A protein has these predicted regions:
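Structural signal for interior beta-strand "rungs" in well-ordered beta-sheet cores
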Residues: 25-138
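Phosphate-bearing ligand-interacting subdomains
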Residues: 1-29
Length: 138
């Protein structure tokens, strides 16, 4: 189980680096980032995304259009946050996880490695490694 895109991205990154490509971070000019946000290598921050204070984004992450990452979140490597998703404050996310379109995650939760959160879901509890969750997740 887990986010296939994370695996594919890892393979593409490995191939690109092996042949000498320089991989860069891309931040849309309409994105809003607090001054103290820490971004890993080759992050993509989409149009109108908002990343607030004391947030750490790992390597090779996609924070897509209109997503909101609130204060104190820690996002692992190869994580995709789809358009319109909201991660409220102090959430810890493992590696290779995927947050579907317009999902919401409650403050202070831990989301494991290789987790898939379905589109439109509301997550109200911690999610273990490898879980796929949909709907209202209690």
């Amino acid at each position: 189980n887990g986010y296939v895109g994370g695996y594919m991205t890892k393979k593409l990154v490995e191939m690109a680096e092996n042949i000498g490509f320089e991989l860069v971070t891309i931040i849309d000019p309409n994105a809003v980032l607090a001054k103290d946000v820490r971004l890993g290598k080759m992050a993509y921050i989409g149009k109108s995304a908002t990343i607030n204070s004391d947030v750490e984004i790992g390597n090779y992450c996609i924070i897509n259009t209109g997503s909101i990452i609130e204060h104190g979140c820690r996002i692992g490597n190869f994580v995709h946050v789809a358009p319109g998703s909201v991660l409220v404050g102090d959430i810890h996310v493992g590696n290779e996880s995927h947050f579907g379109l317009n999902c919401s995650v409650l403050q202070g939760l831990t989301i494991g490695n290789r987790v898939i959160v379905g589109a439109g879901s509301t997550v109200l509890r911690n999610v273990n490694d490898g879980e796929t969750v949909v709907g209202i997740v209690k």
